[in-house]
Amino acid sequence: MSAHYTTEPPPTASATLHTTFGPIHIALFANQTPLTCKNFLQHCLDNYYAGTIFHRIVPDFIVQGGDPTGTGSGGTSIYEYPEFEYDPEARDPNEKVVLRDELHSRLRFNRRGLVGMAKSEDGTYGSQFFITLANAERELNGQCTLFGRVEGDSIYNVLKIAEAERVERTERPVYPVKVVSCEVGELGPFAGKLKRRETIATAPAAEEKPAAKKKKKAKGGKTLLSFGGDEGDEDVPLRPSKPKFNPTLVVDAGIPPANDAPKKTSPEAEQQTRKRPRSPSPRRSLSAERKHRPKTPDPLTQLPLPDPESPARSPPQSPPARQSILSRTRAEIENLKASMRRTVATGPADTGRKKSALEAMIPETAIRGRKRPPPGTVNGAGRGSSTNGVTGFSSAAEDETLRMFNAFKAKLESADAKSGPHGKTSISASDTTKYTSQAKSNTEPEDEEAQLCDLHFIANCQSCKSWDDTGTAEEAPDDDDRDWLTHELRFGKDMLGKDLQWKREHPDDVDSLVVIDPREREKEFVGGKRRGLERDRERDRKRERVGDQEWDRRRREKP
């Protein structure tokens, strides 16, 4: 921020606005913008801004205030008073001053905390000012007069004002911040030229609101002094132009009635009116409303903005919509609950016969349950019932099932008894493996060529063998029908899985998984390398012994 300070000229005057959120210290560039600073300082001296509000808040842009009406369309400059119409610091001292733009090349809206004048529609300035909240060069440079900046920690009070809650879809705060008082610190070049004005400070407010027209009071009857002896005193009675009482309540004999021919009411009608008072007619109420209706305001007077907290004349349309949505949702929930209930009657249809007293006591929504006979009885209601009361199945079918189960059980027991003395018919897994291995070894050389696979050239290849091949089953002898009754199921050792023990017993198996430990391989490689180096060294030693002798011999032979 110091880079921006170096481009700005030094301020020469200062003022302070005391708000409900704290003070705002403003330094003024009086040498660069003399007319604008003079206008602002004079308003501060006159306490013109006391009671005004910050009526406009635009987030990340500006905070605007200085309007005594609080609407954004009020406020006047000091140059509208005769005392300040001519200023020697203006461009033409002989012409009336109209406060317009005072632009300077070193004053730019390039940061927050800069104070400028709010321009009206006709391009002139009044008393309204604004404080920037961010960089606004594109929007404000060359458009509005920059005449000051916020000093010190008071910029945080400006940020608090900018965080105020706003009315929906407007730039007006709900609870606006008010300026309590004004204080002038340094006048700078205006020292000795500006002073506080007591009577003129309130003049613009009186000019803005024109005085209401007062009704002229009725003048009393003009009479001459009477000394009791003049002629005509007795003939002309003195009466006021307007009675001092309500003629509808009090009747004066001296005043003629409003209607020349009053209507005569019959005694019967008078009795009816006494017994039952008549309610006021709508015409009379309408006339009363028209009589008490306020006059239309003057279009030239400034009206304040509508208070956002005041109740609206017409009720909003949103609550009925919410109620309709809520009622629709509740109706959908009730329909869903009703669909989940059992609404179909399970009882017998009405045959038209007369119900007994006991049946009449049963509610219509009751569900009739299934009749169950007591346990132990074959039929519940009578001989014709076909279901059992306990299981719900037919008793005859149940007896037949039990009979068949007992017969099968007896058959198994008899088969075990018959096979017991002769020995067990089951064969252990080890015997079967031995038998199959011997049979294979006996038949392998004979059937090796016949059983070779055409694709893999492997004997008894399981990949090429069809799963539904029943050749072995046809060749096997037929077993007795009763052998399966006494057969015991036993599983042999899985040779295809090749567990760890089998691998240890068959280390040379090609299909077995080979595990290579890199550390062992490293040891073997290092050991072999060392052994190879030792062999090379030994070979070199032998060659050196022989070579030395031959070399020496050849060297000697050379001239």
Swiss-Prot record:
Segments forming domain PPIase cyclophilin-type: 11-184
Chief location category: cytoplasm
CC terms in the record's Gene Ontology section: catalytic step 2 spliceosome; cytoplasm
Compositional bias segments (type: Polar residues): 384-394, 425-442
InterPro entries referenced in this protein's UniProt entry, alphabetically: Cyclophilin-like_dom_sf, Cyclophilin-type_PPIase_CS, Cyclophilin-type_PPIase_dom, Cyclophilin_A-like
Protein location: Cytoplasm; Nucleus
PROSITE patterns: CSA_PPIASE_1 (PS00170), CSA_PPIASE_2 (PS50072)
One GO MF term: peptidyl-prolyl cis-trans isomerase activity
Disordered: region residues: 201-395, 413-449, 518-559
Pfam families from the UniProt entry: Pro_isomerase (PF00160)
Basic and acidic residues composition-biased segments: 261-273
The enzyme's E.C. designation: 5.2.1.8
GO BP term (any one): RNA splicing
Catalysed reaction, written as an equation: [protein]-peptidylproline (omega=180) = [protein]-peptidylproline (omega=0)
Top enzyme class: isomerase
Biased composition range(s): Pro residues: 305-319
Keywords (A to Z) from UniProt: Cytoplasm, Isomerase, mRNA processing, mRNA splicing, Nucleus, Rotamase, Spliceosome
Subunit structure: Associated with the spliceosome.
PANTHER family (alphabetical): PEPTIDYL-PROLYL CIS-TRANS ISOMERASE-RELATED, SPLICEOSOME-ASSOCIATED PROTEIN CWC27 HOMOLOG
Family to which this protein belongs: Belongs to the cyclophilin-type PPIase family. CWC27 subfamily.
Role played: PPIases accelerate the folding of proteins. It catalyzes the cis-trans isomerization of proline imidic peptide bonds in oligopeptides. Involved in pre-mRNA splicing.
Protein name: Peptidyl-prolyl isomerase cwc27
Lineage of producing organism: Eukaryota, Fungi, Dikarya, Ascomycota, Pezizomycotina
